[in-house]
Amino acid sequence: RVFDIIAEPIRFHKTASSEKEIAQIVHDLLEHVGLGESASQKYPHEFSGGQRQRISIARALSCRPKILICDEPTSALDVSVQANILNLLKDLQADLGLTMIFISHDLPVIRQMCDRVAVMLHGEICEIEETEKLFKSASHEYSKHLIKLMPRLHSNI
């Protein structure tokens, strides 16, 4: 059940002193990610992809981290669900004071979500820059190449 999925890291790390406190934390997390307490009694297969991602986010937050690593957090989701998850992550970042590290090939998502970007080439960082500065005037050739390949809307009307 979803309750157990979210409660497991709390129990493992002993960040709550009682089962009652664990239940309250799980309830609060489910509310915070927009699922509600009733989700705790269901199984993952009963949820959509976006809802499962919300469950994963709740689990990741269950031990109150200061840093959240998001590795391709929206890659398997359709565009409208992607937007909802990204908005949720932005809200959680503001509400909880989280630092987030985004790992993604989706440059529009990176542009929307990140303050600073590190571009990697063959497993090594080739450029680190503030997001808008990087997208406007990247200095490394590989960064320029990636930005050039980004999908763009053309207005020929």
Where are these regions (language model features)?
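Short catalytic/signature loops enriched in Gly
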Residues: 128-157
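Conserved ABC ATPase signature
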Residues: 43-47, 51
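Conserved ABC ATPase "signature" region
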Residues: 20-38, 147-148
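Hydrophobic anchor residue at the start of the ABC signature
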Residues: 57, 85
